[in-house]
């Protein structure tokens, strides 16, 4: 099988590094491609290419950059089905998700920043009759994006959109588990007229990430991944004082009060745990249900969860796809075993699905544990699989304290018909992304990111564009220079 490589300088690039790795379809075990591992020479070539691209791109007007990005967004939409299928084969997620969410929401973000950048400007202020100052918002230079494997192309677009809109170049490293869709995205940027070298893709494992974060010519790093790796990214970046944006792990609370709509609450809990087979950092895996609703909630949850369809991700009927890898499958099954040993009651699921031709994949039945306690390992630790923990609570103050008793602070949600209560509770929850009577919505206009060990900085929204710029202040004297020296 031919080795697939990088995308540098507006075209595919093979560095002849002598090292490669296979990327698999996790649902079938099929080898999709062999990917070249980048080395120092490949990265050096990407840096030089990005320098050239940056010199051209940053000299273009905001309107010119906006037109290129809008064309790219339309090309991405035109290739929605092709990109969705590629994403499904590389991640194992259901096509019914990828075909309507992953590609479209990424294109939304590109369009959003393409529109926003036209209003990006500085300020001017008079300091008297002969003096004034003005500021300029200037691009940083070459930015690095390091992606995760659960939403590969969406994450690539979320990172590229504000960086490119502000006039920067980007070197993007996808996860070695899901390296394919970023290459197609790079092609589409080139087709849209984005200058060569502005968006480059380098492939490889953690070693490539370390080279990027430590490189003195990388001006900023945006990373999505787990919290432990995020600490290493931040430490490496600190050596050259480069700013970082990090969207990290979570163990988010979903709080359901007894006045909530039961059907909606159960629906939200299922989406917040089983969407993308549980491999979503913002998932609400700690589901707190007020005692008066608990029994009815658990009864409906069990019935509806057992109707979910686990199957071939390319089948439009499938609702639960394959986990990303055999090693991750073992991790999730290990967490399920630990939950049983800790005394939680298995309500449903809890096993690997192997029938109907799924034996070569990494499928886990949607799993729900009840009779959970806050100190149980599966309640405290991020599992990143279709495993829900249901906990009972009695009053508002109690559940707020319990919900906040975690090292993470990525997301939180509240279901109640009392909007005063909803806002009161949300304002006390230590989380950066919050929902009231819904779960998971993340429009381009809304900044997203975490508190505590769940991250630094934000993606999407107006403030993100500013983080890809630096402020230059210019003081102007119109009169004679007033020197203190004779």
Curated annotation (Swiss-Prot):
It holds the Pfam family Aldedh. InterPro entries: Ald_DH/histidinol_DH, Ald_DH_C, Ald_DH_CS_GLU, Ald_DH_N, Aldehyde_DH_dom, BADH. Keywords: Metal-binding, NAD, NADP, Oxidation, Oxidoreductase, Potassium. It is an enzyme of class 1 (oxidoreductase). K(+) 2 binds at residues 241, 452, 455. The keyword Metal-binding applies. It comes from the Bacteria. Its EC number is 1.2.1.8. GO terms for biological process: glycine betaine biosynthetic process from choline. Binds 2 potassium ions per subunit. K(+) 1 binds at residues 23, 90. Its cofactor is K(+). GO terms for molecular function: betaine-aldehyde dehydrogenase (NAD+) activity; metal ion binding. Dimer of dimers. PANTHER family: ALDEHYDE DEHYDROGENASE-RELATED (PTHR11699). Involved in the biosynthesis of the osmoprotectant glycine betaine. Catalyzes the irreversible oxidation of betaine aldehyde to the corresponding acid. This is Betaine aldehyde dehydrogenase. The gene is betB.
């Amino acid at each position: 099988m031919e080795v697939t490589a990088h995308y540098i300088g507006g075209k595919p690039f093979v560095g002849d590094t002598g090292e490669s790795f296979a990327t698999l379809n996790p649902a079938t075990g099929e080898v999709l491609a062999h990917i070249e591992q980048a080395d120092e020479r490949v990265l050096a070539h990407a840096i030089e290419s990005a320098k050239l691209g940056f010199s051209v791109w940053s000299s273009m007007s905001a309107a010119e950059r906006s037109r290129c990005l809008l064309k790219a967004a339309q090309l991405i939409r035109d290739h929605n089905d092709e990109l969705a299928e590629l994403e499904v084969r590389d991640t194992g997620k259901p096509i019914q998700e990828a075909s309507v969410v992953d590609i479209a929401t990424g294109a939304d973000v590109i369009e959003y920043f393409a529109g926003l950048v036209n209003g990006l400007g500085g300020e001017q202020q008079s300091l008297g009759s002969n003096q004034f100052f003005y500021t300029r918002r200037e691009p940083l230079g070459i930015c690095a994006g390091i992606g995760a494997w659960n939403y590969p192309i969406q994450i690539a677009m979320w990172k590229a959109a504000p960086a490119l809109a502000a006039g920067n170049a980007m070197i993007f490293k996808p996860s070695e588990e899901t390296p394919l869709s970023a290459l197609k995205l790079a092609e589409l940027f080139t087709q849209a007229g984005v200058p060569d070298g502005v968006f480059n893709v380098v492939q490889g494992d953690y070693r490539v990430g370390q080279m990027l974060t430590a490189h003195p010519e990388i001006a900023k790093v945006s990373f999505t991944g787990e919290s432990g790796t995020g600490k290493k990214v931040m430490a490496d970046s600190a050596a050259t004082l480069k700013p970082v944006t990090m969207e990290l792990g979570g163990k988010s609370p979903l709080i359901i009060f007894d006045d909530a709509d039961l059907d909606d609450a159960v629906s939200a809990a299922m989406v917040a745990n089983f969407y993308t087979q549980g491999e979503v950092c913002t998932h609400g895996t700690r589901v707190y249900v007020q005692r008066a609703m608990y029994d009815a909630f658990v009864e409906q949850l069990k019935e509806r969860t057992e109707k979910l369809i686990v199957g071939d991700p390319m089948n439009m009927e499938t609702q639960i796809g394959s986990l990303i890898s055999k090693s991750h499958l073992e991790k999730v099954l290990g967490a399920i075993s630990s939950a049983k040993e800790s005394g939680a009651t298995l309500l449903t699921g809890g096993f690997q699905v192997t029938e109907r031709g799924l034996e070569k994949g990494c499928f886990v039945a949607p799993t729900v544990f009840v009779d959970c306690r806050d100190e149980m390992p599966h309640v405290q630790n991020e599992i990143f699989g279709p495993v829900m923990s249901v906990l009972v609570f009695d009053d508002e103050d109690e559940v707020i304290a319990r919900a906040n008793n975690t090292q993470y602070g990525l997301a939180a949600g509240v279901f109640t018909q009392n909007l005063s209560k909803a806002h009161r509770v949300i304002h006390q929850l230590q989380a950066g992304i919050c929902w009231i009577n819904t779960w998971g919505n993340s429009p381009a206009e809304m900044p997203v990111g975490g508190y505590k060990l769940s991250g630094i900085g934000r993606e999407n929204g107006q403030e993100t564009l500013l983080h890809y710029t630096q402020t230059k202040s210019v003081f102007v004297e119109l009169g004679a220079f007033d020197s203190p020296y004779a």
